[in-house]
């Protein structure tokens, strides 16, 4: 047995494990396969080869049967005897040279440092009492068994342990002749330390414990250090392929921290042959604490170091393994302590694995990191950090230099050639220059599609595009690193931010020379430092990156000055830079510092704006023009530039923040400026400041004609002028005199070409307020002659912007003093292409005369009379577009137009003389389609608001802007406040000198903007009610004097029309006519679901369809599904299915369940003339004709009964003219009796008809106030028990509640 065992041990691979019986075991023990299994033949050949050295190959074939017998018997019967027999044959310990050649399976799974005891421990398979010499070249000295005996004496193996060891060893079986360090590295699994007492007992004094430290690099120490897990091997293999990953795929996405930490330390390592070791073998450092070298993150949870793609973190010696030495911890050890500290601080936002660019081929999610934090804190010297780099098994200490850091000719990073990138950038730039505005593709990616960090990252990404043609400089100092570039870029951005604050600093004493110097300083001094800082950029051209620069304070989300990044980006693009070869022709004259630059993020194409002979600017290109919004100029700025065309030349006059009646205009010559391209839509405080109406501030923002198309759709110009747009939040104060008319046709998502007439050469552009960054733009050329600032009423130009629709183009006509801007309204979701040029008359405030008839020309696709799906219909005065039906009446306009917006030309109403009754104003259409009904009313874009006197709300309209073309101008005249749209993105209320206040509440009552107009001073109160179901109207502005009429219009789904129309919420002809300045009337129409209250108005209110708004004179009641009780001075129409008590002559609702009857003749339901004839369903004088205007008293139901105390709560008793009978109601009775209406209001006027659905109600002989909603009215319904009305509102007193208690007693009777 001893000789057999010795023979077996002399041939470990051939007979013992490989050939004899191990692979011939039963399948139950062979079932466990691993990727490291070797063929049986190879093991057999290895055994034979080993036998040739030791002479034991033949013995393995002979003892195979005996081996099986010994295997089982030793385990079961002869365990103790086996240990004793080991002592008979003792082999000496193997020398380090022998250990160097230990095959893989000789390495015990329990060894961490490769002791011979572990090899012997593994070699004892199944408790077999034999010693395996682990290498064929090792002679069997007699000390080997002593070693094994000591191990076996210290430990007894159970069968389960033996089986486990057998399985492990079988999985590790390999060809001893082909075994090398590579295979050792591959096969090395997670190694367990043997018990310390066993190690000490095994090698007490032979010094073999120190062999690991003293062995040369090729020794077992290298094996142990480089033991890799299977996952690491797979990753190393994937990373070893030379042309696999490019820098863009490696996740080198421009994070400064990663680039500073990695690329400043990389050196041109030679390409290694594919046959070299897959896992790097560091030589000079201490061994790892654990046996595996899988990269791990420091200080972060394991989630951040998890593989985000199947092949992430490709770490290999070919790519970056030689630099990072298979582990970030080992690489950090080679760094100086200061560098390591900075490096770790730079990596605190992300794992070291990702930040070292070891992995993340394709990130699934974007991790926000503070790039500048890592770049600033990274104290890694470029040329002073010796990295212990081992290439090809040797130890090299290479000092990385700046040259090698930026240009790595021999590295495996397949960098994009610099020349090709430069050439590509130049070609793109030339193409951008050549492309004209008319030829832009509508599918361009515009920054308007981006928000927040993505838009900011786009700005940073564009820098190589403009600076890509700059030669890469190889600096000798680390200052030229990308870290420095980021810092300098940030500093330059702050510098520009500081200088952009000087934009409005120029005052009347500004001279051309001073402005020239200042502008040169801005054009060169600001942009050039940025250029210099970006000259030495990393060698790779980065792709579009979405990383948010959290440390860029000026680019952060809570941006203090929204215009700053825009101006910075613009100045980078709009000015010619000497070192970047982007040729951007500029006019001979430098830009004035007061110039309002468009807030364009990047001008991707060089623009040469050519000045035409008439002083208009020809924009040759307008690429990526989407929402071209100027940098927000707040109206309270020190000075706001206004551009004026004086004698055909473009001048900019600077109006101080406190304009006087006589404002001096200092013309400063301006160069031809490129069109605003790549506009930023910044919703920062200045942008949101649009809601802040600065009354005294001048709205003098230079606005130039711009076609803004959402998706790059360029708009055709009759005479294209430069695209400049300010989004200034300055609703004009009463005093703003100078103004620049915005000549902007902004179409949002509009694919149509807009024909905007060039500004006439005769005068300065009048100012018109910019609107919130919501989709509204302000298009229209006003040629307003230089009018004295005393004339407060300017023609407030308004945007014609369509959503998904063509823009109506407006041609302004010249007027003697002030020309009303063309009333161009756009309909959202308009797929037609209406370009309706029309000139609006200009009315001076004092004269009140209409300078010119407005002529409205319909666009090609959308005709006035046709219901275009997006067509824009324009009527001469007010035309309702009801499914394409053209109502040519000047007065009423049916509302239900799905996407068409009707533009009403016509003379503008004189703001000062409110006696001139503006025809009814039409409210908003269905989806915010704007319809301007009155001549002199201008509708805002998405939310329909009649500009002259009322504002309508669109359901999804962003903000409704009310502007009368002449009547309510920025400066003076009736300013229509804009109600907020349904989701009320921005409700803008413009305060004007004349006292007219209109409020529109949107469907879900997002924001209500209300303009307070005082006769002397303008006070604007802007109230926004976010997501309120049923917007409550904001209180009238403080200090209303003279004509103070509160007109608010809320349309259920954007419907609003002057006349009640079925399926269209009514729009009261708000401010339609106020006879005297003393007359104060407020009109409110409730939204679809009857949540807003209606305030009484001098003109009739028409209730919305299917809803009723409880309209008391003063207090609103919201969330009322019942009918609306309108205690209004003149007349109010109740909603269709909502009964309301109307104290004034008004049409009754169609299906009003208990509205009070009128005594005056009203139109029948289906459009019959208003005679007190019984209505369609058996009730007299029904209120609604389907789409037909109700002609009540006054001009188209403009009941101009003015009451000073119309806002009082007792307005029910104010004007008791007539009552409206409900549709299904009974005949009228002279006594007022509240209806049994679900929401029906109690009628309080003496002449009234009997209430329908009356349950034994006895008429009261006295006039009673309307009961509050859900309360019994004073009328004797239910025999005095009180009306069961679900929402009638009236002036109702406390007595109604007491009567309601009598209801129970009535039932008992």
Curated annotation (Swiss-Prot):
Q: Where in the sequence does UniProt note compositional bias of the Polar residues kind?
A: 91-101, 268-283, 597-617, 635-659, 789-803
Miscellaneous note, as given in the UniProt record, is:
Represents a functional homolog of vertebrate Nup153.
Lineage top rank: taxon: Eukaryota
| Task performed by this protein | Nucleoporin required for nuclear mRNA export. Functions as an adapter and/or regulator molecule in the periphery of the nuclear pore complex (NPC). May interact with importin proteins and mediate active nucleocytoplasmic transport through the NPC. Involved in regulation of nuclear morphology.
Region called Disordered, residue ranges: 1-58, 83-118, 173-210, 266-296, 329-348, 384-417, 467-538, 594-617, 635-680, 719-865, 1004-1028, 1068-1105, 1278-1309
List the biased-composition ranges (Basic residues). Answer: 22-32, 1297-1309
User: Where does the record place Low complexity bias?
Assistant: 728-741, 767-783, 809-827, 1004-1023, 1068-1086, 1096-1105
sequence repeats located where? 711-712, 804-805, 831-832, 861-862, 869-870, 883-884, 898-899, 927-928, 956-957, 983-984, 1004-1005, 1029-1030, 1038-1039, 1053-1054, 1089-1090, 1121-1122, 1137-1138, 1151-1152, 1153-1154, 1166-1167, 1177-1178, 1186-1187, 1224-1225, 1238-1239, 1255-1256
One GO biological-process annotation of the entry reads: protein transport
Disruption outcome: Developmental defects, early flowering and altered nuclear morphology. Lethal when homozygous.
For this UniProt entry, what is the primary localization, expressed as one broad class?
nucleus
UniProt-annotated stretches for the region 25 X 2 AA repeats of F-G? 2-677
Official protein name in the record: Nuclear pore complex protein NUP1
Q: Which UniProt keywords apply?
A: Cytoplasm, mRNA transport, Nuclear pore complex, Nucleus, Protein transport, Repeat, Translocation, Transport
Domain note:
Contains FG repeats mediating the translocation through the NPC by interacting with transport factors.
**Subunit description:** Part of the nuclear pore complex (NPC). The NPC has an eight-fold symmetrical structure comprising a central transport channel and two rings, the cytoplasmic and nuclear rings, to which eight filaments are attached. The cytoplasmic filaments have loose ends, while the nuclear filaments are joined in a distal ring, forming a nuclear basket. NPCs are highly dynamic in configuration and composition, and can be devided in 3 subcomplexes, the NUP62 subcomplex, the NUP107-160 subcomplex and the NUP93 subcomplex, containing approximately 30 different nucleoporin proteins.
GO cellular component terms given for this protein: cytosol; nuclear envelope; nuclear periphery; nuclear pore
Q: Where is the composition biased (Basic and acidic residues)?
A: 195-204, 396-405, 660-673
Where are the compositionally biased (Gly residues) regions?
47-58, 1279-1293
Q: Where in the cell is it found?
A: Nucleus envelope; Nucleus, Nuclear pore complex; Cytoplasm, Cytosol
């Amino acid at each position: 047995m001893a000789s057999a065992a010795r023979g077996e041990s002399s041939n470990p691979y051939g007979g013992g494990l490989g050939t004899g019986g191990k692979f011939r075991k039963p399948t139950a023990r062979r079932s466990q396969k691993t990727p490291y299994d070797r063929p049986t033949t190879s093991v057999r050949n290895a055994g034979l080869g080993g036998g040739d050295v030791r002479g034991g190959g033949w013995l393995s074939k002979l003892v195979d049967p005996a081996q099986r017998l010994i295997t089982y018997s030793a385990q079961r019967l002869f365990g103790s005897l086996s240990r004793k027999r080991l002592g008979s044959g003792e082999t000496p310990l193997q020398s380090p040279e022998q250990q160097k050649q230990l095959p893989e399976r000789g390495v015990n799974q329990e060894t961490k440092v490769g002791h011979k005891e572990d090899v012997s421990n593994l070699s004892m398979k199944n408790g077999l009492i034999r010693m395996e010499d682990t290498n064929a070249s090792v002679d069997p000295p007699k000390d080997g068994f002593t070693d094994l005996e000591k191990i076996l004496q210290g430990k007894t193996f159970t069968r389960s342990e033996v089986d486990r060891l057998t399985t492990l060893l079988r999985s590790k079986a390999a060809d001893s002749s082909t075994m090398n360090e590579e295979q050792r590295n591959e096969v090395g699994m997670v190694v367990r330390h043997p018990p310390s007492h066993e190690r000490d007992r095994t090698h007490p004094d032979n010094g073999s414990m120190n062999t690991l430290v003293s062995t040369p690099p090729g020794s077992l120490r290298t094996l142990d250090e480089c033991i890799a897990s299977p996952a690491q091997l797979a990753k190393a293999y994937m990373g070893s392929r030379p042309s696999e990953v490019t820098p863009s795929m490696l996740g080198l996405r421009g994070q400064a921290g990663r680039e500073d930490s990695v690329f400043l330390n990389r050196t041109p390592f030679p390409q290694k042959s594919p046959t070299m070791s897959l896992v790097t073998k560091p030589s000079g450092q201490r061994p790892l604490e654990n046996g595996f070298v899988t990269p791990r993150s420091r200080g972060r949870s394991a989630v951040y170091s998890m593989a985000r793609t199947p092949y992430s973190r490709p770490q290999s010696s070919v790519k970056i393994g030689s630099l990072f030495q298979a582990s970030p911890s080992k690489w950090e050890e080679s760094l100086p302590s200061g560098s390591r500290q900075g490096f770790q601080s730079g990596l605190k936002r992300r794992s070291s694995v990702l930040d070292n660019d070891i992995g993340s081929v394709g990130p699934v999610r974007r991790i926000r990191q503070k790039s500048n934090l890592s770049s600033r804190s990274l104290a890694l010297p470029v040329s002073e950090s010796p990295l212990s780099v081992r290439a090809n098994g040797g130890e090299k200490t290479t000092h990385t230099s700046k040259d090698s850091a930026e240009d790595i000719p021999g590295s495996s990073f397949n960098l994009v050639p610099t020349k090709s990138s430069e050439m590509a950038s130049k070609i793109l730039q030339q193409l951008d220059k050549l492309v004209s505005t008319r030829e832009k593709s509508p599918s361009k990616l515009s920054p308007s599609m981006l928000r927040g960090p993505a838009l900011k990252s786009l700005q940073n990404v564009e820098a190589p595009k403009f600076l890509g043609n700059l030669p890469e400089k190889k600096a000798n100092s680390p200052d030229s690193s990308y870290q420095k570039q980021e810092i300098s870029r940030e500093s330059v951005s702050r510098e520009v931010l500081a200088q952009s604050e000087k934009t409005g600093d120029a005052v009347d004493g500004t001279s051309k020379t001073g402005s020239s110097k200042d502008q040169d300083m801005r054009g060169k001094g600001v942009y050039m430092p940025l250029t210099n800082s970006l000259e030495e950029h990393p060698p790779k051209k980065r792709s579009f990156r979405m990383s948010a620069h959290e440390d860029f304070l000026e680019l952060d989300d809570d941006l203090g000055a929204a215009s700053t990044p825009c101006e910075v980006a613009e100045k980078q693009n709009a000015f010619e830079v000497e070192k970047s070869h982007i040729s951007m022709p500029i006019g001979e004259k430098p830009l004035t510092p007061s110039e309002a630059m468009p807030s364009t993020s990047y001008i991707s194409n060089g623009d040469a704006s050519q000045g035409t002979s008439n002083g208009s600017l020809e924009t040759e290109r307008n690429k990526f023009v989407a929402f071209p919004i100027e940098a927000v100029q707040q109206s309270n700025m020190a000075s706001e530039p206004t551009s004026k065309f004086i004698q055909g030349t473009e001048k900019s006059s600077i109006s101080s923040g406190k304009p006087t009646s006589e404002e001096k205009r200092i013309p400063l010559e301006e160069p031809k400026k490129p069109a605003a391209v790549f506009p930023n839509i910044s919703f920062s405080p200045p942008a949101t400041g649009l809601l802040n109406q600065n009354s005294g501030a001048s709205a003098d923002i230079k606005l130039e004609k711009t076609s803004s198309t959402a998706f790059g759709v360029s708009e055709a110009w009759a005479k294209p002028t430069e695209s400049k747009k300010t989004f200034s939040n300055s609703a004009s104060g009463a005093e703003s005199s100078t103004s620049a008319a915005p000549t902007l046709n902004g179409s949002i998502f509009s694919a149509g070409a807009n024909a905007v007439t060039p500004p006439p050469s005769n005068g300065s552009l009048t100012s018109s307020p910019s609107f919130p960054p919501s989709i509204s733009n302000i298009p229209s050329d006003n040629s307003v002659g230089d009018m004295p600032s005393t004339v407060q009423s300017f023609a407030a130009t308004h945007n014609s912007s369509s959503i998904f629709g063509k823009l109506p183009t407006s041609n302004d006509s010249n007027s003697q003093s002030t020309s009303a801007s063309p009333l161009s309204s756009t309909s959202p979701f308009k797929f037609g292409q209406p370009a309706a040029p029309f000139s609006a008359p200009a009315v001076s405030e004092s004269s009140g005369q209409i300078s010119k008839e407005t002529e409205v020309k319909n666009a090609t696709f959308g005709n006035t009379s046709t219901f275009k799906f997006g067509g824009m219909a324009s009527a001469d005065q007010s035309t309702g577009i009801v499914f394409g039906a053209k109502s040519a009446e000047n007065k009423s306009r049916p509302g239900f137009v799905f996407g068409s917006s009707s533009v009403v030309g016509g003379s503008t109403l004189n703001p000062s003389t409110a006696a001139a009754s503006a025809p009814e104003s039409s409210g908003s259409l269905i989806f915010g389609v704007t319809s301007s009904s009155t001549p002199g009313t201008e509708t805002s874009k998405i939310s329909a608001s009649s500009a002259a006197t009322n504002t309508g709300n669109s359901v999804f309209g962003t903000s409704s802007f009310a502007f009368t073309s002449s009547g309510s101008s920025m400066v003076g005249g009736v300013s229509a406040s804009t109600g907020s749209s349904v989701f009320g993105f921005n409700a803008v209320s413009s305060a004007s000198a004349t006292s007219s206040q209109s409020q529109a509440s949107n469907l879900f009552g997002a924001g209500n903007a209300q303009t307070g107009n005082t006769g002397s001073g303008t006070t604007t109160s802007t109230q926004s009610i976010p997501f309120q179901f049923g917007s409550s109207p904001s209180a009238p502005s403080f200090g209303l004097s003279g004509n103070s009429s509160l007109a608010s219009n809320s349309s259920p789904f954007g419907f609003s029309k002057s006349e009640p129309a079925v399926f269209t919420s009514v729009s009261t002809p708000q401010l339609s006519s106020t006879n005297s300045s003393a007359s104060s009337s407020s009109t409110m129409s409730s939204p679809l679901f009857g949540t807003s209250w209606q305030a009484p108005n001098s003109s009739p209110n028409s209730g919305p369809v299917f809803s009723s708004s409880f309209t008391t004179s003063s207090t609103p009641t919201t969330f009322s599904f019942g009918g609306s009780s309108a205690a209004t001075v003149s007349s109010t129409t109740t909603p269709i299915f909502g009964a309301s008590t109307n104290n004034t002559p008004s049409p009754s609702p169609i299906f009003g369940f208990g509205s009070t009857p009128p005594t005056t003749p009203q139109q029948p339901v289906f459009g019959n003339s208003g005679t007190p004839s019984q209505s369609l369903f058996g009730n007299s004088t029904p209120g609604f004709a389907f789409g037909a205007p109700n002609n009540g008293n006054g001009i188209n139901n403009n009941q101009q009964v003015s009451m000073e105390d119309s806002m009082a709560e007792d307005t029910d008793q104010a004007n008791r003219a007539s009552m409206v009978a409900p549709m299904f109601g009974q005949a009228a009775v002279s006594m007022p009796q509240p209806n049994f209406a679900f929401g029906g209001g109690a009628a309080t006027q003496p002449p009234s008809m009997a209430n329908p659905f009356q349950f034994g109600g006895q008429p009261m002989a006295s006039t009673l106030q309307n009961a509050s909603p859900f309360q019994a009215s004073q009328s004797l319904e239910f025999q005095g028990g009180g009306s069961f009305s679900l929402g009638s509102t009236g002036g109702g007193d406390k007595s109604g509640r007491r009567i309601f208690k009598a209801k129970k007693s009535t039932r008992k009777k």
